[in-house]
From Swiss-Prot:
This is Translation initiation factor IF-2. Residues 391-560 form the tr-type G domain. Gene3D superfamilies: P-loop containing nucleotide triphosphate hydrolases, Putative DNA-binding domain, N-terminal subdomain of bacterial translation initiation factor IF2, Translation factors, Translation initiation factor IF- 2, domain 3. It is found in: Cytoplasm. Belongs to the TRAFAC class translation factor GTPase superfamily. Classic translation factor GTPase family. IF-2 subfamily. PANTHER family: TR-TYPE G DOMAIN-CONTAINING PROTEIN, TRANSLATION INITIATION FACTOR IF-2-RELATED. Residues 400-407 are annotated as: G1. GO terms for molecular function: GTP binding; GTPase activity; guanosine tetraphosphate binding; translation initiation factor activity. It comes from Yersinia pestis. Residues 65-296 are annotated as: Disordered. Residues 255-269 have a biased composition (Basic residues).
Length: 892
């Protein structure tokens, strides 16, 4: 081959000249762009590049497409033509295994040639040495014989001696050549035998290595024949003829399509039949005994398990998890059963369960965060980082036991009459107010003290800075007082104790201090950290001292907040107003909330259409520690949800819908989670009576508290099921739901509209209104008590001792008895006792006194008793008469 320059070679292989020169230098060949390159240097460069980058197996792919027509007979003697297009593909791969086998064969052949050459050289060398040694020995023998002979007649005998000397030499030479040839043959046979043994050993090692590699993922060596195109092995003329036939078939199809009618094929028309048609006809002629196609694919089942990276979201179904791990759904269900969880293939499971199952099956789990949109929305907020934090008013929550004077104390501070407006004189939802004092502003949260409002008190403690614990001086520490202390400690909030009702004669502040010290509230005069202020909400005693104590505690806490930027806060209370829509009471914690802001509140979103303070006045903005009512949300938010102002309303809507969907999925995943240990409990659920209830309330917090209280009333025999609950008036939808589920409707501070009342009258539903939570809970208890199974008690009413036994033809054995205790009545159940052991339990059939039938016999009188179906009465037995009394059960 003619040598080329480096520059022309770079142009030929389409690579920069500098890069090619550098590659030659890396391979150990110094070249410039004008130097010539030999074929040997090209091979050296190619070997170097293969070592550096790895060799890619040569691959040749041939594709072919065949179109044909298939006639399918149908009903009515007609036939339907179906156009078939067959695409074939054949790939030739120069696999590394073939190259390795070729290299091994070449190495074996070279080894045999080398061994043969070495054997020939060794044999020739041995033969030459042996011939030389024999020639020397022969020369010595001849010299000895020559010395012994007489030198007589030298001239005459010279020719004769020469002839005699030449003849043995020729004979010896022939013998030496024969021995050398024999030695050469033996050496060649020995060498060939060794070479064959080496070749067998190499072949055996190669076979073992192939057997080991066969157990792993096999390379598609059979790809040449498996995915082969038929036309590759045919001749050029056969391919041309078949292409011409396919072209004619395609032309006929197009002409029929243009003509608008499909002409019927002639039976013997070979031109209109393609290769696929002919194969189909032969298959039908053999009655379905079709020859297996050479295009059949083979699959070798993998032996080694494949570990995958499984990406799991917050919720996933069993079928989706199985697809991610590339296993059957039954295997995932089996793995979950081994872990103690029952599941179906379409069941939604939570992220933790899916992670356990995937790791149990040997896969690597990647947990995916699906709230990226929410994080992006929250990060794109102007929160006034550059602005300096300013002092803000403290948020004070008033907590304590019911009727200890919390609202009355706040009422005196605000100089309003709120307590008189509360139903029953007790607070039923959180009231948020801010008060301007001489020393600064204070925001008060008034929480209910009833036991049903536990979650509302906890919510108030989490949103507050200081807790004012109101304890009545005449009542001391009560259960809700203890609960308030626990909420304050859980929220890590300082406590200021207000000992109320100090003006009463029976007031004992020292007892309150002693009782509170048992729960970790130590007064300052005892060395503790809590301030104790004696107050009277009625007389106004100690109110200024209480406010000063609150402000002093706030100064110690150094409460600060940023007033500029987008606001965030917490929902204190929410309800549905018929004229204004969803209304939420929001306590602003950071920033400034303005009218027109876009807010994201839990599962709800919206634009603030209007803002009002606690007095009902319209305002346009609210800073930190200010409670406001906002209008414009999509629905009623849950109390305790975080309120955040965002920029984009569209993204806020997407985040709210995403939260709703996730909440629903997680809730379903938790509900459907069925453990093996709960199976027996689930089997007996059908025996429990259920009281279905539909609850409507005026505010979200009260509705939540009522639902929690009623669900806690459930027992093993009667279960309270809240069919529906909500905020707002009772509508026709609520009445229809109650009628369909057989539920009673409870309205708390709400009323039913005209359409709902019409459904209630038509269906005969039980509709009740309440304004105090005590009455609601008590009446539900009574309804549950009526659903309890009755309890029966056996009460002994009389004892009679058998003195004698008589025989009666009508009743059999008659016991003559003396009534020793109580009254004996006819037709009552009795027991026969012998030696204080019950031997029979039955019914009293006959009761007589002096041969007269009587209904009862009193203490100290004699009578005759006939026991029904029992004749084994003996003297000395005791007959015990009792009656069964039904006991009315109640819910504790």
């Amino acid at each position: 081959m003619t040598d080329v320059t480096v520059k022309s070679l770079a142009a030929e292989i389409q690579t920069p000249v500098d890069r090619l020169v550098q590659q030659f230098a890396d391979a150990g060949i110094k070249k410039s762009d004008v130097d010539s390159v030999t074929q040997q240097e090209k091979e050296i460069l190619l070997a170097h590049l293969n070592r550096e980058h790895g060799s890619v197996p040569n691959k040749l792919t041939l594709q072919r497409k065949t179109r044909s027509t298939l006639n399918i007979p149908s009903t009515g003697g007609k036939s339907k033509s179906v156009q078939i297009e067959v695409r074939k593909k054949r790939t030739y791969v120069n696999t590394p295994e073939a190259e390795q086998a070729k290299a091994e064969e070449q190495a074996q052949r070279e080894a045999e040639e080398q061994a043969q050459r070495e054997a020939e050289a060794t044999a020739q060398k041995i033969a030459e040495e042996k011939a030389k040694r024999e020639a020397e020995e022969q020369a010595k023998r001849e010299a000895a014989e020559k010395a012994k002979r007489q030198a007589a007649e030298k001239e005459k005998v010279t020719n004769q001696q020469t002839d005699e000397k030449t003849k043995p030499a020729q004979t010896d030479k022939a013998r030496r050549e024969a021995e050398a040839a024999e030695l050469k043959r033996s050496v060649e046979e020995e060498t060939r035998r060794k070479v064959e043994e080496d070749a067998k050993r190499v072949a055996e090692e190669a076979r073992k290595m192939a057997a080991e590699n066969e157990g792993k993922w096999p390379e598609p060596v059979a790809e040449q024949t498996e995915s082969a195109d038929y036309h590759v092995t045919t001749s050029q003329h056969a391919r041309a003829a078949e292409d011409e036939n396919d072209a004619k078939v395609e032309g006929d199809r197009r002409s029929r399509t243009r003509g608008g009618k499909a002409t019927k094929q002639k039976k013997g028309n070979k031109l209109s039949e393609s290769k696929a048609d002919r194969e189909e006809a032969r298959a039908v002629g053999r009655k379905g005994k079709r020859k297996p196609s050479t295009l059949q694919q083979s699959f070798n089942k993998p032996v080694v398990a494949v570990n995958r990276d499984v990406v799991i979201g917050e919720t996933v179904t069993v079928a989706e998890l199985a697809n991610k791990m590339a296993v059957k759904g039954s295997q995932v269900i089996k793995a979950m059963m081994k872990l103690g969880a029952m599941a179906t293939i379409n069941q939604v499971i939570d992220q933790e369960t899916a992670q356990l199952v995937a790791e149990e099956m040997g896969h690597k789990v990647i947990l995916r965060r699906e709230n990226e949109l929410e994080e992006a929305l929250m990060s794109d907020r102007d929160i006034g980082v550059e602005a300096a934090a300013e002092h803000r008013a403290p948020v004070v929550t008033i907590m304590g036991h019911v009727d200890h004077g919390k609202t009355s104390l706040l009422d005196y501070i605000r100089s309003t009459k709120v307590a008189s407006g509360e139903a029953g004189g007790i607070t039923q939802h959180i009231g948020a107010y801010h008060v301007e004092t001489e020393n600064g502003m204070i925001t008060f949260l008034d929480t209910p003290g009833h036991a049903a409002f536990t979650s509302m008190r906890a919510r108030g403690a989490q949103a507050t800075d200081i807790v004012v614990l109101v304890v009545a001086a005449d009542d001391g520490v009560m259960p809700q007082t203890i609960e308030a202390i626990q909420h304050a400690k859980a929220a890590n909030v300082p406590v200021v104790v207000a000992v109320n009702k100090i003006d009463k004669p029976e007031a004992d502040p020292d007892r309150v201090k002693t009782e509170l010290s048992q729960y970790g509230i130590q007064p300052e005069e005892w060395g503790g950290e809590s301030q104790f202020i004696n107050v009277s909400a009625k007389a106004g005693i100690g109110i200024d001292e209480l406010l000063n104590a609150i402000l002093l505690q706030a100064e110690v806490l150094e409460l600060k907040a940023v007033r500029t930027g987008m606001a965030n806060g917490v929902v204190i209370e929410s309800f549905l107003d018929k004229g204004r829509g969803p209304v939420a009471t929001v306590l602003v914690q950071q920033g400034t909330l303005n009218k027109g802001d876009i807010v994201l509140c839990g599962f709800e979103y919206g634009r603030v259409r209007a803002m009002r303070d606690e007095l009902g006045r319209d305002i346009t903005s609210a800073g930190p520690s200010i409670p406001v009512e906002i209008l414009g949300l999509s629905s009623v938010p849950a109390a305790g949800d975080e309120v955040t102002v965002v920029r984009d309303e569209k993204k806020a809507r997407e985040v709210a819908l995403y939260r709703q969907g996730k909440f629903r999925e997680v809730k379903l995943a938790r509900q459907q989670k069925s453990k093996l240990e709960n199976m027996f409990a689930n089997m007996t659920e059908g025996e429990v009576s259920e009281l279905n209830i539909v609850i409507k309330s005026d505010v979200q917090g009260s509705c939540e508290a009522i639902c929690d209280s009623l669900e806690k009333l459930s027992t093993d025999e009667v279960k309270v099921r809240i069919v529906g609950s909500g905020v707002g008036g009772i509508t026709e939808t609520d009445a229809t739901l109650a009628a369909a589920s057989g539920a009673i409707i409870l309205g708390f501070n709400v009323r039913a509209d005209a359409s709902a009342r019409r459904v209630v009258e038509t269906e005969g539903l039980d509709l009740r209104y309440y304004s105090v939570i005590y009455s609601l809970i008590d009446e539900v208890k009574q309804a549950m008590s009526g659903m309890l199974a009755p309890e029966y008690k056996q009460q002994i009413i009389g004892l009679a001792e058998v003195r004698d036994v008589f025989k009666s033809p009508k009743f059999g054995a008659i016991a003559g008895c003396m009534v020793t205790e109580g009254v004996i009545k006819r037709n009552n159940p009795i027991r026969v006792l012998r030696d204080n052991v019950v031997i029979y339990e039955g019914e009293l059939e006959s009761l007589r006194r002096f041969k007269d039938d009587v209904s009862e016999v009193r203490n100290g009188m004699e009578c005759g008793i006939g026991v029904k179906n029992y004749n084994d009465v003996r003297t000395g037995d005791v007959i015990e008469v009792f009656e069964i009394i039904e006991i009315k059960r109640t819910i504790a």
